[in-house]
Amino acid sequence: MPAKTVGRVTLDDADQQLLNLIQTEFPLVTRPFAALGERIGESEGQVMERYARLKADRIIRQVSAIFDTRKLGYRSSLVATAVDESRVDAAADLISAHPGVSHNYRRDHEFNIWWTIAVPPDERLETHVAALHRLAGATSTRILPTLKLYKIGVDLDVSDQRAMGAQTIIPAYTETARTAADLTPEEVAYVLELQEDLQVEATPFASMAGRLGASEDALVKAAHGLIGEGLMRRYAAVLNHRRAGFGANAMSVWSVPEAATDDYGYQLAGYAAVSHCYRRPTYPDWPYALFGMIHATSKERVEEAVADIQATTGLSDYRLLYSTKEYKKIRVRYFDPAYGQWAAANLLPEDARD
């Protein structure tokens, strides 16, 4: 792959190979950087140096476990909020202060703040959303939970060589029997540790295991077990989209005939350019049931993908909601006491009303 310059950072061929790999298959083995080196033709030390540089350049945000929120007993939802333009930033900051808000963006739509929230099993999601609606001074809020998951699995083609109309070429996490599991205290301990950002060490899982008083083999085995049980979707990197050269982040939303929603959902999910694809509820002021996230290097590339989708599906009633500002993007922290602390400080009796 030719070298690629993003801002002040130049990504050579090995950088691009490494970034493409670790988004989907960071090795859950005792010496992961050595395993990655075998894939890209470098030594363990070279890969560690490369990884550390990409982390310092803030292209790699984090490497950690990605868990299935529902399987852990949490409830989550996308939420759309409309706030007066004069106070969007202040409202977004109030929303971002909630420990369960993992993503929060300003988008070019009447609903101008879009955020995702997850709450523990002993908390009511609607109550937390009502409180945030109140605190933000919102004029309108729509809760848009996942009714069906067709695909989730960000795979940014850092080389930008893949056609936007290409079909999915990697396995992506799709809907299964996603019912909450009863976790043992030992499993909770592993979740708490595996959600932490990976350290740049030859044997990083040994350090994690040591903090738990467990062996490295036991932790690696437990991680694979969590994947097998469907509690963990994968262990992988999350990149800073913009710093990796993906300046266009569009949420494509599609109005489709209700009886054919699944057919169109699976078609949309089949595109490699679509990282997330869901069915969500509609409202009188929101007729779009299908959501497909598209990340690209430019708006032109996004529109190229959408043109291919239109040509294949025949769908024409859609909107592209571009993110114009990122307020927050983290991974959800599970079993964190901050949830209870936030609730005690912010929830009012009126928030619990339907």
Q: Where in this protein do the model-derived segments appear?
A:
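A compositional/biophysical signature of low hydrophobicity enriched in polar/charged and small residues
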Residues: 1-354
